[in-house]
Amino acid sequence: MSILSIVLTGFGLAMDAFAVSVAKGITLTRVKAKDALKVALFFGGFQALMPLIGWGAGRYFADYIKAFDHWIAFILLSFIGGKMIFEALKEDDEEKAEVAVSMEVSKNKEREFANMKRKEELSAKNLTVLAIATSIDALAVGVSFAFLGISIVQTIIIIGIITFVLCFLGVIIGEKLGDIFKNYAEIVGGVILILIGINILLEHTGIIEKLFS
């Protein structure tokens, strides 16, 4: 698995966390740099930790499934990517309108209870739950890493940094631009993961080598 593939996988995995970070930016008024930093640290940290856990589990079973490990990686990445796309597209126009209204209502309430809302949104408990929820996919992808012969330390550092940067920017973007980009981010992330899965399958079955030989 090349560095480029790892970077693209990092972007794909980070899109759920990015979308949630945008939502955080929407619900917070007058976002400060330390607010964005806190969100980014939680999401980036868990996004790096989960693949490591998955990799450890995958290594335990690697010898038993080595003959078809590339199919496992392909299926996991394609399933996760497809799930992200499906979840982003399943909301109809009526639901989106309701979300837009609820966001506007929450902003009005937020002006009255800004301090209380900020503490709730940025609490360690709240961020931990969200960080775990958005990094479950990374746990599954981490299992596939065990079969690819990659440097797990280098990989989780790359994934963690990408998630950190995107989530930091996501909070700021959320405050400025609202929830326009949330679903698009998840769709892009899903497509990236599916393409990475296809690439792994083609590489390990020798199809790419035959095409370019």
Swiss-Prot record:
The lineage of its organism: Bacteria, Bacillati, Bacillota, Clostridia, Eubacteriales. Belongs to the MntP (TC 9.B.29) family. Pfam families: Mntp (PF02659). Probably functions as a manganese efflux pump. This is Putative manganese efflux pump MntP. It is a multi-pass membrane protein. The keyword ATP-binding does not apply. GO terms for molecular function: manganese ion transmembrane transporter activity. Its main location: membrane. GO terms for cellular component: plasma membrane. It is found in: Cell membrane. Keywords: Cell membrane, Ion transport, Manganese, Membrane, Transmembrane, Transmembrane helix, Transport. The chain crosses the membrane at residues 3-23, 36-56, 67-87, 130-150, 152-172, 187-207. InterPro entries: Mntp/YtaF (IPR003810), Put_MntP (IPR022929). It comes from Clostridium perfringens (strain 13 / Type A).
